[in-house]
Amino acid sequence: MTAPWRRLRSLVWEYWAGFLVCAFWIPDSRGMPHVIRIGGIFEYADGPNAQVMNAEEHAFRFSANIINRNRTLLPNTTLTYDIQRIHFHDSFEATKKACDQLALGVVAIFGPSQGSCTNAVQSICNALEVPHIQLRWKHHPLDNKDTFYVNLYPDYASLSHAILDLVQSLKWRSATVVYDDSTGLIRLQELIMAPSRYNIRLKIRQLPIDSDDSRPLLKEMKRGREFRIIFDCSHTMAAQILKQAMAMGMMTEYYHFIFTTLDLYALDLEPYRYSGVNLTGFRILNVDNPHVSAIVEKWAMERLQAAPRAESGLLDGVMMTDAALLYDAVHIVSVCYQRAPQMTVNSLQCHRHKAWRFGGRFMNFIKEAQWEGLTGRIVFNKTSGLRTDFDLDIISLKEDGLEKVGVWSPADGLNITEVAKGRGPNVTDSLTNRSLIVTTVLEEPFVMFRKSDRTLYGNDRFEGYCIDLLKELAHILGFSYEIRLVEDGKYGAQDDKGQWNGMVKELIDHKADLAVAPLTITHVREKAIDFSKPFMTLGVSILYRKPNGTNPSVFSFLNPLSPDIWMYVLLAYLGVSCVLFVIARFSPYEWYDAHPCNPGSEVVENNFTLLNSFWFGMGSLMQQGSELMPKALSTRIIGGIWWFFTLIIISSYTANLAAFLTVERMESPIDSADDLAKQTKIEYGAVKDGATMTFFKKSKISTFEKMWAFMSSKPSALVKNNEEGIQRTLTADYALLMESTTIEYITQRNCNLTQIGGLIDSKGYGIGTPMGSPYRDKITIAILQLQEEDKLHIMKEKWWRGSGCPEEENKEASALGIQKIGGIFIVLAAGLVLSVLVAVGEFIYKLRKTAEREQRSFCSTVADEIRFSLTCQRRLKHKPQPPMMVKTDAVINMHTFNDRRLPGKDSMSCSTSLAPVFP
């Protein structure tokens, strides 16, 4: 409900009450007594608490005077009061004073506030049926039969619900409850029962008994890192706790205190405004109502005159909750008495046990009353007389003082109304002009020592990506900082006992405010500290030295096809040639007349002899002609299929040849994490107590579990830091598992190292803060702003870009060297040598036959043939003559020449002359 609506409703109630009084009760005012008496019993004690008791008495007088001056409430009637003072815990004296006031004819008794005294007075009022007005919290058992009372203090069950709703709104998962006395356990029973219904862990502690020194307890909570604490105590004790917490160094932004007292607004909180502590409380005084503010100001003026010196720890002239409740109680009694003008008041005697005749009627009027007072809406439960319907303001300490941040009511629950004060695009309220301690670790290129000829001090000693990021954040948020290296040089990991080390421990112990480093955001770390949004995303990968390029073989031209394919091609060649030979012998269309000029010749010839069939297949495979063309359909089908086969094979070979001969293949023994896990020759590991090690340690994937088992079984597999791991990778057969961003930086500067495979996982680097730190959200907003402005990318380019490695020769196609295709020259040379040897064999074989035919010596025949061959100008020679000449007009029988003909000659000349054997 908004403040203007509450103010309007307050004015409506006030005017409505006045209207009722004027319209209905004034005509009957003649029957009213001219004087109405009420009684007030207040505890009094010597010492520093006397001023508080006097404040209640002052409020009693103050409210009566206000009513008497406002003639619309009790026209023609004067409200008088009787005040009695008693000592603390003196119930006998309280009983006696109550009887004295009843004898005076009071219509109601207000107070006392202390438990045993309250019970004594309540018993008397219940017996004589006189309303008893209570103003302090009091436990009422379920079997309580007292009905002549109302309590203006909010019901404890509702207050406990309000505290629980606030804790849930703050998303607390753990808290410490500190109570003053045993009644606190009753008041906070809803909160104490929360762990059984909600995911909240509570630790219960009690303040020291009979002592105001809470420092031992505060020290114990500080040592136990209990940062979220709920104090159930009086405002006096709250003031002492705040002072002692300040002395203990606990008034920082990491602590959040909730005080259940409704008088937190009355404390002097000036010393804590700029401490950054999170201080939250409740307020029932409706200061948003202008009418209430006017009454409070009038009270302050009179209070300062009556008591110039305020109680220690309180603001001067402030109206406490008890005083406001007493003010409202007096007004309610006056208004209710106005509604019953025919009542008469008698003097009552305690020893006679004779009740007031109109007491029950008057008590019902009070329980049915509705009033908008200083403490907001006042409505009583008609059965119990408790105040169960009310509004509570949620107040929080800011740099400008206490501010209202929300409203709670039993019907509507908690409604947070705080609006962040934005100054442009950045929210910098709690970081401006603050000095923060920043912990970090040396890690290139994130944090490095700056190289300089002169000695550097402070933050000037460092440079790197994280240092630039820290400068940008400080510029946006307006804070200053001091950089400190973590003592153990570790990022932060949890041991088997649950203890942390490294930067995480520094944040947990509040030795640092921020951890600005390549700190990986993990689930385990999130349970101990808070993280901002990631400023860089990455993943785990493998760093390994570059493999050496393989020396190419002179027979590299065979690599495009596997040995199996080469064998299959050879078998296909042999098979097709043989099938072609057989089919050609069977097909009648492959036989033709060898002598078309001789019609009577009975000799036919077939071109596809076995050798010619092999020659046809070889010519097709080599994409060359053989001058042998199939004539039959069957042989043409074989030829066509073979040509298609050779087309695909040669095209595939040609396409793959370029890749194999122009790109030098880099053979690495590992290509992925699976390859690492399957072997034991190459040792691998990670930085000890780092996020990468934790990833493998906590992983449930079988491959990573196997890798962690290998690393944990060999202590030498884990290195102390990245530098040690890099050096080991260069000098030994070792692979380092690390973040991809670091690998990218290293490989830009060391050309002997490379990244193997892709990313094993995906994660991010974030800025760490202590759990519950108010700086986290503001740093996150600043990081998002830097990301939108592309400054994060610019900073990464600045620190990651190195001189770079020279372009590798295998990145582009280059001229082929003899080492890659020298084998083809060897094959050519071998073919030439083979052809020479075959030619020599043919030469010797033919000349031996010629010498026998001509009956000449073999040597002379060889000499003549060599002499003729060396005569390069002559193109013709005489055919060797057999012993017996053949007639010139005889038809040459093809069987004489073993049925042979010259290839490609479909017809022969019919000349009677002899054709030369060697054209």
Swiss-Prot record:
Reaction it catalyzes: Ca(2+)(in) = Ca(2+)(out)
GO BP terms: namely: regulation of membrane potential
Subunit structure comment from the entry: Homotetramer, and heterotetramer with either GRIK4 or GRIK5. Can form functional heteromeric receptors with GRIK2. Interacts with PRKCABP. Interacts with NETO2.
Query: Which portions of this protein are annotated as coiled-coil regions?
Result: none
Q: Where is this cross-link: Glycyl lysine isopeptide (Lys-Gly) (interchain with G-Cter in SUMO1)?
A: 887
- A GO cellular component annotation in the UniProt record: postsynaptic density membrane
Under which name does UniProt file this protein?
A: Glutamate receptor ionotropic, kainate 3
Q: Where does L-glutamate bind?
A: 518, 520, 525, 691-692, 739
